[in-house]
Amino acid sequence: HWDDYLTELGVVYDPFLDEMWTAKSGGKARLNGRVIRVSETDNLESSVVSIGFAKSKTTLKRNLPLFARLYQRVLKVRLMGSAALALTWTAAGRLDAYRENGISLWDIAAGGLILECAGGEFWRQPLRGKYTYELIASNGRLRKRIERLI
């Protein structure tokens, strides 16, 4: 269960873009040493949202209809392929929100801390199975609107 763990330090490296994302609990989030902040987008119609698909039939059944609903309501939907990068891109304002169901703790712990230190909201809920979560990560302005689509 998530509450049993506390992330003190988050580091995510993207070797393709040579980008290092870092944050220390209580501090500021940084990209290659420069402080980053989440976007200020406050409506779905102007937002860029990433959705992730964990490797399970249940997740696929649940997320495909959500993908269709998001596609009709947001500016753009993106599939990052990496939970850590979707979280860090949300932290830097490249994305406005990220949604995934059935993701593992080790995929989201570092990026979640980086997002929170950048002023974002990292909402997560434990699911059945060890260290598995449902999450909505956002700039702090869009979670409730995304929840209504779920």
Q: Which residues does each predicted region cover?
A:
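Short secondary-structure boundary segments
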Residues: 53, 101-103, 125-127
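Acidic donor-binding loop at a coil-to-helix junction in glycosyltransferase catalytic cores
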Residues: 106
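CN hydrolase (nitrilase-like) catalytic-core segments centered on the catalytic cysteine
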Residues: 97, 102, 110
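Alpha-to-beta junction loops
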Residues: 92-97, 119-121
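Acidic beta-strand-loop-alpha-helix segment within the catalytic core
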Residues: 1-86, 134-150
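Acidic, metal-binding active-site segment of PIN/NYN-like and related structure-specific nucleases
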Residues: 119-135, 139
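Short active-site alpha-helical segment characteristic of glycosyltransferases
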Residues: 49, 110-111
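Hydrophobic residues within well-ordered alpha-helices
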Residues: 88-91, 112-117
